[in-house]
């Protein structure tokens, strides 16, 4: 990775950034506070363009969400990405059509929100009016000589209590019950204006609470009718708007393209916000792969700019982004590495070393020709038809590679959906014994498979130790390399020779070196405690790591047994059709469980047992300005 610094003309900034984005190899970083003298007079650009790009991207996403709601697209698990030429993708006509459609859809969507708000408000008002529908008095009350109160009182406020109140006011008060429920009486109280205050005070003493109908005139029934008519009009308008939005379903492809264009523009504006400049020039700093420097310089030849590239200093390593360089075989493993953590800059890319182990181990655990065929077919069909990119593309590429390994290991163990063919032949032709040729049987050769699993684990552990040895030697940590790796190799060789009956001399030498290591490397009392700590940690660590690889045998055995059990159950009716249906259902469940289970266990072996020996994590992902798209395949 190279550090890039570029000084260019402000008038060419937009075109230059588009050229960089088209190359997809430059990550623009924020200008730090160093070299203030150089940067004096430079300022950050305003964020108006960034906010506009964010708004445009949000508008297209909102429009697409509305289409998904009112004009849902029939689609399966995966959406096919339509191929679009760059000329058509970036054309002004395409953008204008999509913008007009998005504005129309979003305007209608906002109106739907307003309609929903009005509907909720009107329904709440109708609920408030419901207890008063039998009352003919106007809700606005009365003025002058007559005072009118709408209100509620508890059920404990009886007619006798109200009659007593009316008597105390010389009969200048009367009331009418509009309705009641389980806890309240809804009362209309009328009195002469001269006793209004006395009546209201006495009513409150009884627990009477007034109800206000602000802004309403006429009776409750009249207002309820008006609200019902308004709700009907709103419902009609809502249906018309939804139909209008649904009628724009044909604009979906244009909106998908526009959403991708907006995302590309937004990435460019975010990068632009990290620049500094004046009204004449701008300054850009960032990172690009070393092998793209010449191509970048050639691309920028038409522009008036000065470019400087240099190797990063060791102090800059934590800030240097990491880009994994892989071929077709190792690229799918990016998703595994990124799920764990990218390697720190300046350290080793683990993918080429991990790929053969990951793919082989997955095949060992799955070990079935039928399952392998399904994985390969799914990988090819999805990759060709839907052209997934990014992590999804890596996932299906890895699925295909693991499918090949699964098929090969299945051929070695004679598994095709378990013993599907054996059981099928027995049903079709009773008395006929048929079995696929196999090198070994998971059920009969358990000991051999167990030893083989641990042997493969030992190979991967030693590989990790060898990588660690090389890296330590590069950093001139020769003592660490000798006592951490070479010493234990001597121990491993000694154990192997002892098991073969060749004596224990080499093992004794290895053990002596294990005890000597902490003494040579430790200080003070640490020499003594280090002997026991190192011995315990390494012995238990290596022993536990090697035992972890027995999961290769366990998952191979589990998958094989489950498949055979389902086939056995399916064969019980003795009917070919019933056998095929039951067997396929059982194998489908077994396949689904093993597909995920083998991945998880394989991932654990790589991340905990293998990476633990040499891997230095903490890398910062390389995020250049790109033309990555979500919905279309840019060609």
Sequence positions of predicted segments:
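Conserved, carboxylate-rich catalytic/transport cores that coordinate ions
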Residues: 1-2, 9-17, 21-28, 294-635
């Amino acid at each position: 990775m190279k550090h890039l610094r570029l000084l260019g003309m402000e008038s060419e900034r937009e075109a230059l950034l588009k050229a960089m984005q088209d190359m997809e190899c430059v990550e623009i970083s924020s200008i730090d506070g160093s070299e203030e003298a150089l940067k004096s007079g430079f300022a950050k650009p305003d964020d108006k363009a960034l906010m506009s790009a964010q708004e445009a991207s949000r508008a297209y996403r909102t429009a697409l969400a509305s289409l998904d709601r009112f004009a849902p697209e029939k689609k399966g698990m995966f959406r096919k990405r339509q191929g679009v030429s760059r000329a058509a993708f970036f054309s002004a006509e395409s953008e204008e059509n999509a913008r007009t459609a998005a504005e129309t859809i979003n305007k209608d969507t906002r109106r739907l929100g307003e309609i929903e708000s009005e509907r909720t408000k009107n329904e709440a008002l109708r609920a408030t009016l419901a207890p008063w529908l039998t009352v003919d008095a106007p809700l606005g009350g009365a003025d002058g000589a007559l005072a009118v109160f709408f209100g509620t009182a508890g059920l404990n406020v009886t007619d006798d209590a109200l009659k007593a109140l009316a008597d105390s006011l010389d009969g200048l008060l009367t009331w009418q019950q509009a309705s009641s429920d389980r806890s309240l009486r809804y009362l209309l109280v009328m009195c002469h204006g001269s006793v209004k205050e006395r009546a209201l005070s006495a009513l409150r003493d009884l627990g009477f609470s007034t109800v206000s109908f602000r802004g309403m005139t006429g009776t409750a029934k009249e207002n309820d009718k008006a609200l019902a008519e308004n709700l009907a009009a709103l419902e009609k308008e809502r249906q018309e708007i939804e139909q209008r939005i649904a009628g724009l379903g044909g604009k979906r492809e244009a909106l998908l393209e526009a959403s991708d264009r907006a995302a590309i523009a937004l990435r460019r504006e975010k990068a632009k916000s990290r620049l500094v400049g004046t009204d004449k020039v701008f300054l850009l700093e960032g990172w690009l792969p070393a092998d793209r420097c010449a191509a970048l310089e050639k691309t920028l030849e038409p522009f008036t700019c000065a470019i400087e590239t240099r190797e990063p200093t060791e102090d800059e390593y934590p800030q240097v982004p990491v880009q994994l360089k892989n071929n077709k075989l190792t690229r799918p493993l990016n998703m595994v590495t990124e799920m764990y953590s990218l390697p720190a800059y300046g350290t080793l890319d683990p993918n080429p070393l991990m790929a053969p182990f990951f793919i082989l181990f997955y095949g060992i655990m799955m070990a079935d020709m039928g399952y392998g065929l399904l994985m390969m077919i799914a990988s090819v069909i999805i990759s060709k038809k839907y052209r997934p990119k990014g992590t999804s593309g890596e996932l299906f590429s890895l699925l295909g590679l693991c499918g090949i390994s699964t098929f090969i290991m299945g051929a070695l163990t004679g598994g095709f959906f378990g013993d599907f063919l054996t059981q099928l032949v027995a049903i079709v032709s009773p008395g006929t014994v048929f079995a696929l040729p196999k090198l070994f049987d998971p059920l009969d050769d358990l000991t051999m498979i167990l030893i083989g699993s641990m042997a493969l684990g030992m190979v991967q552990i030693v590989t990790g130790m060898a990588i660690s040895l090389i890296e330590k030697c590069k950093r001139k940590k020769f003592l660490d390399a000798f006592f951490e790796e070479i010493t234990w190799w001597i121990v491993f060789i000694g154990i192997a020779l002892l098991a073969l009956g060749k004596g224990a001399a080499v093992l004794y030498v290895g053990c002596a070196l294990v005890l000597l290591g902490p003494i040579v490397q430790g200080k003070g009392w640490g020499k003594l405690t280090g002997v026991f700590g190192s011995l315990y940690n390494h012995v238990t660590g290596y022993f536990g790591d090697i035992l972890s690889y027995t999961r290769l045998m366990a998952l191979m055995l589990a998958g094989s047994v489950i498949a055979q059990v389902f086939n056995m159950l399916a064969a019980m009716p003795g009917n070919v059709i019933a056998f095929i249906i039951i067997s396929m259902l059982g194998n489908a469940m077994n396949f689904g469980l093993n597909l995920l289970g083998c991945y998880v266990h394989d991932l654990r072996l790589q991340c905990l047992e293998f990476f633990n020996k040499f891997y230095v994590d903490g890398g910062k992902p390389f995020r250049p300005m790109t033309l990555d798209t979500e919905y279309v395949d840019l060609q």
